[in-house]
Amino acid sequence: MTQFDFKKLVDAEYLLNNRTNNNIVVIDARGGMLEEGSLMYDKAIVVDWTDISLLGEFGGEELGKLLSKKNYQQIFSKLGITDESEVLVYGFTMPEQGFGDEARVLYTFSYAGFDNVKFIDGGFKQVEKLEFNKKYVPTTDRIDVSDIVRSEATQNEKAIYTDELLSKIGNTDVQIIDTRLEAEYNGRVIYGENKAGHVPGSISLPFNSLVDSNGFLKSRAVLEKYVTDKGLDKNKLQITYCTTGVRASYVAVILEELGFKVLNYEPSFARYANVGEVVLD
């Protein structure tokens, strides 16, 4: 049951009630983590975060950045998104699986000027219960962006990059939020970063701690108390990071809804570990 009153969040019943609505575009954001033959919603298009982001070397400055608005218009055309469309996105059901990819889509499309995007609370486990499923065939069910010549976003007002981040470490008007797992914050390398640890002074706020055991976003009151107890201050700028900016996008979307000013460090810790000081508390 949806507990968080957020206009960008709907339950699976909303998807069911709009099943015959031709203006609805459904995105399965599980992307490359979805194995061939796995169940998916029968009207969905599979999109990976790498399909809608700049590519580059792991640990470089480019990987994880958003694309140009021209690129997103090309992607919208492939997805069948028009000005009349409403996009519904689901991902894996956290906390067991997933990285909050559904909110990464929302974050990305918002930059591109398309705001009529909602993500489905509880993830695919709730969608699956609707019983309108099919088996995933990558060659036909995943978006093909191979013909798009990618270029970098400009004037991305909700992102921050490495040089600016480095200049803000230690700034008392800024709080840096590590959205990775607590184990990663404490020094475990899971996804191949060059160093273990975290950005000096950063606060650990794991992305999947925002959902309950069934994968539903916790209530506004519970989340407000949680982030306050973590020390987050609405009078300060929040900067979120993870490994390549996906989990950080999820937390950024929720924090913004809670009233925080947030920037997402898109190259994230994969890049930072190559150029910045890393600490273990």
Q: What are the language-model segments listed below?
A:
Residues 1-12, 17, 124-200, 277-281:
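Active-site neighborhoods of enzymes that stabilize oxyanions during catalysis
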Residues 34-41:
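Short loop/helix-cap segments at secondary-structure boundaries that form the rim of catalytic
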Residues 63-163, 247, 251-270:
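Thiolate-centered catalytic microenvironments shared by cysteine-dependent enzyme domains
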Residues 225, 235-242, 246, 252, ...:
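C-terminal soluble interaction/assembly domains
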Residues 12-34:
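Hydrophobic alpha-helical membrane-insertion signals
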Residues 54-86, 207-238, 276:
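Helix-loop module immediately N-terminal to the HCX5R catalytic loop
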Residues 22-24, 83-86, 172-174, 200, ...:
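Loop/turn elements at helix/coil->beta-strand transitions in domains of secreted/extracellular proteins
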